[in-house]
Amino acid sequence: DSNTIRRSAEIFLRQGGHEVVLAEDGFDALAKVNDHAPELIFCDILMPRLDGYQTCAIIKRNPRFAHVPVIMLSSKDGLFDKARGRMVGSEDYLTKPFTKEQLLRAVDEYRRGGSAV
């Protein structure tokens, strides 16, 4: 479930030496992005209240955060889902469940220092 995946991602990232800020839903994510100015954002597509696509689009429309890489997370592995993520501005897409290695590889590829939400 989402809490298990979120907790696993948090553990993997902390073990990799990264600072992690978690959000409960899309609105919480937007507030935390504003407060913490992360260098990389992981965005679950199926977040409550404001889904990951909407959250990513709002982040990318904000000039302050448009440059921040967003990696979408989803249990769906369809071409349409990946294309929709690209259309709203995400840089990459990880399919759940993902391994620690896949998650940290994505961080290494996109992170320029700082925290991940």
Describe every region a protein language model picked out.
Residues 98-108:
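C-terminal output helix
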Residues 3-21, 35, 110:
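Two-component/phosphorelay signaling modules centered on CheY-like receiver
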Residues 47:
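Receiver (REC) domain active-site loop signature in two-component systems and cognate sites
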Residues 36-42:
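Active-site beta3 strand of CheY-like receiver
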